Amino acid sequence: MIIVTGGAGFIGSNIVKALNDKGITDILVVDNLKDGTKFVNLVDLNIADYMDKEDFLIQIMAGEEFGEIEAIFHEGACSSTTEWDGKYMMDNNYQYSKELLHYCLEREIPFLYASSAATYGGRTSDFIESREYEQPLNVYGYSKFLFDEYVRQILPEANSQIVGFRYFNVYGPREGHKGSMASVAFHLNTQLNNGESPKLFEGSDGFKRDFVYVGDVADVNLWFWENGVSGIFNLGTGRAESFQAVADATLAYHKKGSIEYIPFPDKLKGRYQAFTQADLTNLRKAGYDKPFKTVAEGVTEYMAWLNRDA
């Protein structure tokens, strides 16, 4: 069996889909479905079982067995960069991850987990997986950074696979439940379909991020599991592209609309990453050599998925 925590969420459900595409359906999805809308992410997928996150954590902490586990993909976390309840964030993203990590180490189960580019904070260059480049801007980034630091202490002695992925700006199918935290591409598409002008912040041709398609993210996860490589790796495309490029690809797909530029909100000043670009040196050195979709390629594929019933 394979366990995917956060399996009803955005990246988790895409990992479940990637496993299904390989004929793997003996999957336990762990999640919190208090937000019942997330069920739609699993409707077209095949899994063996579902368990609530709290029940799962109780069983993990009690050392209970789940049969033969081939791997745990740990995508379950609070991923809101605007959540400032530090206790909630540390319980969810740090303590929970530590419990799972030790459970896996004791049983030599491969443990693949979600880290984040938020560990780098507000820097505009040198997004490199090393302590001197890491200075998170919010408690979410700090929770991810601290777990990476914890993993670094353990990696040299570990007898089983531990791999963390620092996700950059992930977008693509199955993120609709994320609301305001969903990608720009998702919001632009919704605005167009509602007959509104799609909106970007003023200066969006100058705001550049490493936008990575979720299908590529799932592919990297599975490749590392299949190849048993350990470490902490950036997971982006290695190419920064502008928010304007995302909008251009969205408008090109819809063949209509024009962008309305809105003032940059004061509350985001100083807390907004103006530029991100993954350094893929370590990822490539580890052996992953497949190309990543450009914004034009990924957004076009995503638009086709979002508008498949139109």
Swiss-Prot record:
Its EC number is 5.1.3.20. Substrate binds at N169, S180, H187, F201, E202, G203, S204, R209, Y272. The active site is at Y140, K178. One of its GO terms (molecular function) is ADP-glyceromanno-heptose 6-epimerase activity. Binds 1 NADP(+) per subunit. It catalyses: ADP-D-glycero-beta-D-manno-heptose = ADP-L-glycero-beta-D-manno-heptose. Pathway: Nucleotide-sugar biosynthesis; ADP-L-glycero-beta-D-manno-heptose biosynthesis; ADP-L-glycero-beta-D-manno-heptose from D-glycero-beta-D-manno-heptose 7-phosphate: step 4/4. GO terms for biological process: ADP-L-glycero-beta-D-manno-heptose biosynthetic process; carbohydrate metabolic process. SUPFAM superfamilies: NAD(P)-binding Rossmann-fold domains. InterPro entries: Epimerase_deHydtase, Heptose_epim, NAD(P)-bd_dom_sf. NADP(+) binds at residues 10-11, 31-32, 38, 53, 75-79, 92, 144, 170, 178. It is an enzyme of class 5 (isomerase). CDD domains: ADP_GME_SDR_e. Keywords: Carbohydrate metabolism, Isomerase, NADP. Its cofactor is NADP(+). It comes from the Bacteria. Coiled coil: none annotated. Catalyzes the interconversion between ADP-D-glycero-beta-D-manno-heptose and ADP-L-glycero-beta-D-manno-heptose via an epimerization at carbon 6 of the heptose. Homopentamer. Contains a large N-terminal NADP-binding domain, and a smaller C-terminal substrate-binding domain. NCBIfam families: heptose_epim, PRK11150.1. Belongs to the NAD(P)-dependent epimerase/dehydratase family. HldD subfamily. This is ADP-L-glycero-D-manno-heptose-6-epimerase. It comes from Klebsiella pneumoniae subsp. pneumoniae (strain ATCC 700721 / MGH 78578).
